[in-house]
Regions:
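Hydrophobic alpha-helical connector segments
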Residues: 77-113
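Residue-level detection of the helix-turn-helix DNA-binding "recognition helix"
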Residues: 46, 60-61
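DNA major-groove recognition helix of helix-turn-helix
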Residues: 59, 70
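Amphipathic alpha-helical packing segments from all-alpha helical-bundle domains
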Residues: 122-147, 154-161
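Basic, helix-initiating cap at the start of DNA-binding domains
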Residues: 1-34, 38-53, 67, 74, ...
Length: 202
């Protein structure tokens, strides 16, 4: 079983994403059975009935088999649009609402399984941290462009750093509480950021 794909995608793109998700499912099954480190790209390709070159072409690395999805690029596109008309937090909420709808319509088990490896597998977690650093820089540039600030300004760095780090914390919390909806956890996280809280009270 593979997650549902967004209807707005073209047929060719949907076929490609479907093939990629089938490879990801095969990889997750093998990782669960044999351990992440014991499974090779070649073994994943055989299980998915594709060539190793196809796996490398689609994903590049074994870590990418876990981390790849369509949500981060979609979120950045939505944020760019929303920042034209809204302040930072409103733009984030609106962009996340749109993107999370696609995520919620996908497969809960698929996303839970992927995120468990992000949390518990050091190599995947390290690669994800690099991705978050890159996203941090992209959002900082975006926010600076829309506000007239320098992306290196402390205000920009703190705002974007708080958002990205808090989103990662929300995902980790969701992995530990799979009975919860990720959208609800993210919404609660955004409330905490926006309202602020006294660190001395924790």
């Amino acid at each position: 079983m593979t997650p549902d794909l967004p209807e707005r995608l073209g047929l060719r793109e949907r076929k490609k994403l479907r093939a990629m998700q089938q490879i990801q499912w095969a990889a997750l099954d093998l990782f669960d059975q044999h351990g992440y480190d014991a499974v090779t790209i070649e073994r994943i390709a055989a299980a998915a009935e594709v060539s190793p070159s196809s796996v490398y072409r689609y994903f590049g690395t074994k870590e990418r088999l876990i981390l790849h999805d369509e949500y981060d690029p979609a979120l950045l596109r939505e944020m760019e649009i929303e920042l034209d008309e809204h302040d930072f937090m409103t733009a984030v909420r609106r962009a996340l609402a749109s993107t999370m709808q696609t995520l919620v319509q996908g497969d809960h088990e698929f996303n839970q399984r992927r995120m468990r490896y992000v949390v518990h597998e050091p190599a995947v977690r390290a690669r994800m941290q690099q991705d978050m650093d890159e996203m941090n820089a992209v959002i900082a540039e975006m926010l600076a462009r829309h506000t007239g600030h320098d992306p290196a300004d402390l205000e920009i760095r703190v705002a974007v750093g708080a958002l990205v780090s808090s989103f990662v914390a929300a995902v980790y919390y969701w992995v530990d509480h799979p009975e919860l909806a990720l959208s609800d956890v993210v919404e609660q996280t955004l409330d905490l950021i926006e309202q602020g809280f006294d660190l001395r009270s924790i």
